[in-house]
Amino acid sequence: MALDAFFFIVSLFLLFPSPSASESTTQFCSAGRENGVGSCGVSSTRILIKGGTVVNAHHQELADVYVENGIIVAVQPNIKVGDEVTVLDATGKFVMPGGIDPHTHLAMEFMGTETIDDFFSGQAAALAGGTTMHIDFVIPVNGNLVAGFEAYENKSRESCMDYGFHMAITKWDEGVSRDMEMLVKEKGINSFKFFLAYKGSLMVTDDLLLEGLKRCKSLGALAMVHAENGDAVFEGQKRMIELGITGPEGHALSRPPVLEGEATARAIRLARFINTPLYVVHVMSVDAMDEIAKARKSGQKVIGEPVVSGLILDDHWLWDPDFTIASKYVMSPPIRPVGHGKALQDALSTGILQLVGTDHCTFNSTQKALGLDDFRRIPNGVNGLEERMHLIWDTMVESGQLSATDYVRITSTECARIFNIYPRKGAILAGSDADIIILNPNSSYEISSKSHHSRSDTNVYEGRRGKGKVEVTIAGGRIVWENEELKVVPRSGKYIEMPPFSYLFDGIEKSDANYLSSLRAPVKRVRTEAT
């Protein structure tokens, strides 16, 4: 037994070379690393959830849910089952689809370092917070899409929950165009991201964006944009440095909301010109939200994704005299002044914005200190994978801004629909994957970097308390979070291929045909000879 215990401790050390305080008290199952199965009580193949209120995006009902071998088999009242079934009592609680986070960056090399959360630690944190799938962004290797995909295949090998990939486009040539087609048809990628910021590294020009939009349209893939005017941001950064503003507040001052609004408007107009759907990631300002609202009102297919930090926080933290505190709030686009977050909440509750992500991109305080003397070198990113589901419930459902069905829609179902994996994901329906949470609306939570499951030693939601706690998480038919205990198995997560031509492409061909018929061109002209 002593030898077994020794190897168990060694395996934990290898998984977590830089553990946070919380990881020393949390159980991570390392059994079965080679074949993806374990024996720590997480692999029950039959589960009956009794007496809860089952909530989907379209309705809710009192019903039981029966799961076998990772699939929801039945959703109906008073299900009777035989022996060897794990029974969970959900009386007085909500039974919901597990959250799907459309926007994460795990094991990402960025700004001279790498995010502190890899796929295993980030996903473990997600499961503790009720998120059962995420979609991460693949960054090409020197512009090479295939090399980038292969690198992220390796990064994600230890995954403990299901995940998908978006792909970033950082340059353009015929090879990129061919690789996009291969990734869509053979690798299950149906979305491509274009950065309009980060001049000199990830940023693309308008001509490249236009080529990318055309290629996305032809492939049935969704074009996504990080919308900030990168040239103006670069100028703003120089201006701040010249003024002697080198701290985290300079980050916000150099990238004001107007630059996010301008880039959002530009991307929307170019997408309209090509007639292809557009997804705007991390909408942080009223300026950007207003542009999305105008486009949607006109009938354009534009998706707006706020992130939980932009909905909940404001930028006063960036002026904190303690660099360690201020720097942990640095992300791009920046967290905005008071008023923007509430406006984004209103837009989310009225359908102007469609779903909530996190942009989970974590660095510890040592990494953030890389920009101690120059805000331009502070690694951009905040946490959110573990906190999103709790914060949105407490902030928007408890306040009456959202119903329980709306909550499911913006945290799970709409993401599944947009990325064409519904109803496999995002639903409590017979035949859907058994990714399920049990949320107790009367239970409370408190957020702390000392107890969270991220490897980061900081948390931008430190000390927040609220109501509505995820008490049980089931991922792939396995109970992975229960009684405040996290039990996850490396290599138990699956890569989820996402097919092209989601519902957002419905009607595109017809509108193209209508456009062509409206041109009254080319005009047939009769050549007349001069007399």
From Swiss-Prot:
Keywords: Endoplasmic reticulum, Hydrolase, Metal-binding, Zinc. It is found in: Endoplasmic reticulum. It catalyses: 5,6-dihydrouracil + H2O = 3-(carbamoylamino)propanoate + H(+). One of its GO terms (molecular function) is dihydropyrimidinase activity. Its cofactor is Zn(2+). Zn(2+) 2 binds at residues 193, 226, 282. Coiled coil: none annotated. GO terms for biological process: beta-alanine biosynthetic process; cellular response to nitrogen levels; uracil catabolic process. Pathway: Amino-acid biosynthesis; beta-alanine biosynthesis. The keyword Secreted does not apply. GO terms for cellular component: endomembrane system; endoplasmic reticulum; Golgi apparatus; plastid. Its main location: endoplasmic reticulum. Induction: Up-regulated by nitrogen limitation. Homotetramer. This is Dihydropyrimidinase. It comes from Arabidopsis thaliana (Mouse-ear cress).
